[in-house]
């Protein structure tokens, strides 16, 4: 009897006796059942969809960012949830003028943020000092002298649409990062420092120009003798008239 059964029948009989429930059926379209990705892509996708900003507003630029909270722009659709604690935030948005007294507080907030963290410099006063960079002794000429900046957003002030564009560009940067490369590029210094090669240069200014006469003094010295001679001639003529 066993010799009359085909190999296929024997296989089916064995499956029925060994596994009465039957083997699970796998569909031919594997793309609907299997997701293939890398750890970097999965990690970046989770982070770019939930950027929690810490809002550091010191001047008028922050008013434009406050407009994003309303229903007209609704920045919640990007996953932005404002936080009041730096330990719960991964994005620092600096908007407004940064003074010398506020610089240590800003650096402390940045240090308390967990890795990975990002910084957006919003407005001209934050990037370069703005109108206070000319004659102010208390304004910081650029927040990148204190903390590393990932994205610069110029404007005085920037519009809410420009802030959305900056967030989208930052999301693209987050999506292309690697965990290993991010660990290599972590900041090791308290402040953002740059190595400079100082060369000794002697000044060409010897101070001789202070002893030189100006062009006005030279011209006045040339004109004075003529005036004196004309006055002498007038005096001699008047004396002659009196004698006559």
UniProtKB/Swiss-Prot annotation:
Residues involved in [4Fe-4S] cluster binding: 60-61, 125, 156
Membrane topology: Peripheral membrane protein
Catalytic activity field: a plastoquinone + NADH + (n+1) H(+)(in) = a plastoquinol + NAD(+) + n H(+)(out); a plastoquinone + NADPH + (n+1) H(+)(in) = a plastoquinol + NADP(+) + n H(+)(out)
Keywords, ordered alphabetically: 4Fe-4S, Iron, Iron-sulfur, Membrane, Metal-binding, NAD, NADP, Plastoquinone, Quinone, Thylakoid, Translocase, Transport
Key word Translocase present: yes
UniProt-listed Enzyme Commission number(s): 7.1.1.-
Bias (Polar residues) ranges: 231-244
PROSITE patterns (alphabetical): COMPLEX1_20K
Location (main, coarse): membrane
Residue ranges of coiled coil: none
Top-level taxonomic group: Bacteria
Cofactor(s) needed for function: [4Fe-4S] cluster
GO cellular component, one term: plasma membrane-derived thylakoid membrane
Region entry Disordered, spans: 213-244
InterPro entries with a match to the protein in the record: NADH_UbQ_OxRdtase-like_20kDa (IPR006137), NADH_UQ_OxRdtase_20Kd_su (IPR006138)
Record-linked PANTHER family: NADH DEHYDROGENASE, NADH DEHYDROGENASE [UBIQUINONE] IRON-SULFUR PROTEIN 7, MITOCHONDRIAL
Function field: NDH-1 shuttles electrons from an unknown electron donor, via FMN and iron-sulfur (Fe-S) centers, to quinones in the respiratory and/or the photosynthetic chain. The immediate electron acceptor for the enzyme in this species is believed to be plastoquinone. Couples the redox reaction to proton translocation, and thus conserves the redox energy in a proton gradient. Cyanobacterial NDH-1 also plays a role in inorganic carbon-concentration.
Assembly and interaction partners: NDH-1 can be composed of about 15 different subunits; different subcomplexes with different compositions have been identified which probably have different functions.
Protein name: NAD(P)H-quinone oxidoreductase subunit K
GN (gene name): ndhK
